[in-house]
Swiss-Prot record:
Methyltransferase in keyword set: no
Family indicated by similarity: Belongs to the bacterial ribosomal protein bS16 family.
NCBIfam families linked: S16
PROSITE patterns, per the entry: RIBOSOMAL_S16
Gene that produces this protein: rpsP
Alphabetic keyword roster: Ribonucleoprotein, Ribosomal protein
Tree of life domain: Bacteria
InterPro entries, A to Z: Ribosomal_bS16 (IPR000307), Ribosomal_bS16_CS (IPR020592), Ribosomal_bS16_dom_sf (IPR023803)
This protein's GO CC annotations: cytoplasm; small ribosomal subunit
Species this chain originates from: Geotalea uraniireducens (strain Rf4)
The keyword Ribosomal protein appears for this protein: yes
Protein name: Small ribosomal subunit protein bS16
Length: 88
């Protein structure tokens, strides 16, 4: 089972709010997920993201692949650098 760390859309029309979730890559965007690891609110200025660092690092260690957007969020939060330094 290939897992992805990706955004699941929530919120109202024209007011998106996203949950950062770990899901099987075959599931729908807003469908079933394995675990919720954070949130992302692009409506705030600047955009607000809250991630559970321990859970995120655990899933990255298990081989979950982040999408491009989530990878950028992880870099801004500093989690991606911690993961890469653990690998080295």
């Amino acid at each position: 089972m290939a897992t992805k760390i990706r955004l699941a859309r929530a919120g109202a029309k024209r007011k998106p709010f996203y949950q950062v979730v770990v899901a099987d890559e075959r599931c729908k965007r807003d469908g079933r997920f394995i675990e919720n690891v954070g949130t992302y609110d692009p409506n705030q200025n600047p955009a607000v993201f809250k991630l559970e660092e321990a859970k995120t690092l655990e899933w990255l260690g298990k081989g979950a692949q982040p999408t491009d957007t989530v990878k950028q969020i992880l870099k801004k939060a500093g989690i991606w650098e911690k993961f890469v330094s653990k690998l080295a």
